[in-house]
Amino acid sequence: MSFSVDVLANIAIELQRGIGHQDRFQRLITTLRQVLECDASALLRYDSRQFIPLAIDGLAKGVLGRRFALEGHPRLEAIARAGDVVRFPADSELPDPYDGLIPGQESLKVHACVGLPLFAGQNLIGALTLDGMQPDQFDVFSDEELRLIAALAAGALSNALLIEQLESQNMMPGDATPFEAVKQTQMIGLSPGMTQLKKEIEIVAASDLNVLISGETGTGKELVAKAIHEASPRAVNPLVYLNCAALPESVAESELFGHVKGAFTGAISNRSGKFEMADNGTLFLDEIGELSLALQAKLLRVLQYGDIQRVGDDRSLRVDVRVLAATNRDLREEVLAGRFRADLFHRLSVFPLSVPPLRERGDDVILLAGYFCEQCRLRLGLSRVVLSAGARNLLQHYRFPGNVRELEHAIHRAVVLARATRNGDEVILEAQHFAFPEVTLPPPEAAAVPVVKQNLREATEAFQRETIRQALAQNHHNWAACARMLETDVANLHRLAKRLGMKD
C-alpha cells in the first residue's frame, strides 16, 4: 500500500478544518489512524526532556494526563534522539509506553510501533507515535511516506507553538529561539471549568493586577499561582511562597516585612522579609484569610503605596511586588463577619479566579489519575501502572472531598497495595485497592464485544463473565454486594459463576 495524492491532500485538509489547535490535532491523528489502519495514534509535544500528549486516538483517556519523561521510556528516548523514522521490531526489548493503555487490549503487548520525531528547523518539538497489535502492521508503508506525514504534522505543531508564543506575554531571553521559552506549569484538565480557568489565567497573567484565587482545599490553587507567574512578564524573577496559616502571630510581621538587628529577642542580624525577596517578582500568599486584622492593615498599606518597613526600622523600603492570594474561605462572608477587611478584600480581588472542585470536572479525574500513575511508575521503577475498568468507574463516581490532593494520595496508596499483592513490575489498579467510603456505582456498562465467529450462547456467556468480573472488582470481590448490584439472588449468582467456569 502507498499513499495517493488524495490521501495526503485529505490529511492536509483536515489540518485546516479545525477551529482551534486542539481540534486540528485531533482530526490529524484520527485521520492517520484511519489511513494507516492502526490501533492507536498519538501526537506528543516535546518539552524539557518529556513528551506531553496533545491528542490521542485509540488510547485510554488517561493517557492525556500522563507526562512521559525520557529517562523512564526508552522507546520515546530513541525517538527523541533519532532524526528520522524509527521502527521498533515486534520483539524489541524496549517496553512500549502504551502497553496496557489500548482499550479492550489491556492484557496484550503492543507489537508494532513507529515513531516519527517532529522538528522545527533543528529543534525537536514533538513526535507522532503509531501503534498496532499486529507485528507487520506498518510494513506496507515506506519510510518516505511516513516522512511526508511527519512533515505535515510538524508544520501544524510548529505553527501552533508559534501562535501560542505570540499570544503569550512572556519576555524571552534575547538569544532564545522560538522554542526555548520558559517552561510553564502544566495544568491538566479538559473540562469546561478548567478550560475557562486556563483562559482567565492567560488574560490576567499578562497584566500586573493582584489576583485572589479561591477554591476548596486540595484543588490546586498554588498551581494556578505558578501558572500565572510563569506566563507573566515577571517570570524571570522570583515567585515567593508564604503560607499564612502556618505563621505564628509573634513572627508573622517579620516573615512578611523583615526585621533589623535587635528589633526583638533573637533578632541577631538584619533579615529580609518575603516582600523584599519577591521584589520585581511575585508573592503568593496562601490561606490569606488566616491573617490577623492587624497584619491585614499593614498588608493593605503595602498594596496601596508599595513601601514596607522592617520590624524595628523607621525607614521605608520601596518594593515592586505583584501579590497573588489564595483562600479556601468565602472572604465576602468573612468581611460581613468582621474577620476580614473589606478594603483589603477589594484590593486583592481585582481579578478573582475560582478553581473548580474535582467533583465538577468530569473526566478530568481520569486524566489526573493517569498523571499520578505515571509519577508512581517512575518513582517505584515499575514498567507500567494502569487502571482497570472497575477502578476507572470508581474514580469517576467518587466525590473526592479532598479534591486533587486526595486523588493523588489515593493513587499512590493503591499502587503500593497493588504492588505488594502482585509479582513483577507491572501494576494494574483494581477497585479494591482504593479505600474510599461507600460509593454508589451505576450498573457496569457492557464492554464492547468485537464481531467474531461464535454462536449466541457463547456470546451471551462471554458477556455474563465480563459483567460479573466488573461487578466483583467494584465490590472488592464481595459476592453478596455483587449480587445486590446485579439485582440477583446470591445463590443464583454463585451457580451462574460455577457454570461459567468462574468458580470451582
Swiss-Prot record:
Quote the DNA-binding region ranges, renumbered to this chain: 479-498
Record's InterPro entries? AAA+_ATPase (IPR003593), GAF (IPR003018), GAF-like_dom_sf (IPR029016), Homeodomain-like_sf (IPR009057), NorR (IPR023944), P-loop_NTPase (IPR027417), Sigma_54_int (IPR002078), Sigma_54_int_dom_ATP-bd_1 (IPR025662)
- Give, as in the UniProt entry, the pathway in which the protein acts: Nitrogen metabolism; nitric oxide reduction
Tell me the domain of life.
Answer: Bacteria
Which GO molecular function entries does the Swiss-Prot or TrEMBL record give? ATP binding; ATP hydrolysis activity; DNA binding; DNA-binding transcription factor activity
The family database entries (PROSITE patterns) matched by this protein are listed as: SIGMA54_INTERACT_1 (PS00675), SIGMA54_INTERACT_2 (PS00676), SIGMA54_INTERACT_3 (PS00688), SIGMA54_INTERACT_4 (PS50045)
Transmembrane ranges, per UniProt, are none
- Sum up the protein's function in the record's words: Required for the expression of anaerobic nitric oxide (NO) reductase, acts as a transcriptional activator for at least the norVW operon. Activation also requires sigma-54.
Which PANTHER family is this protein grouped with?
A: ANAEROBIC NITRIC OXIDE REDUCTASE TRANSCRIPTION REGULATOR NORR, TRANSCRIPTIONAL REGULATORY PROTEIN
Protein name, as recorded? Anaerobic nitric oxide reductase transcription regulator NorR
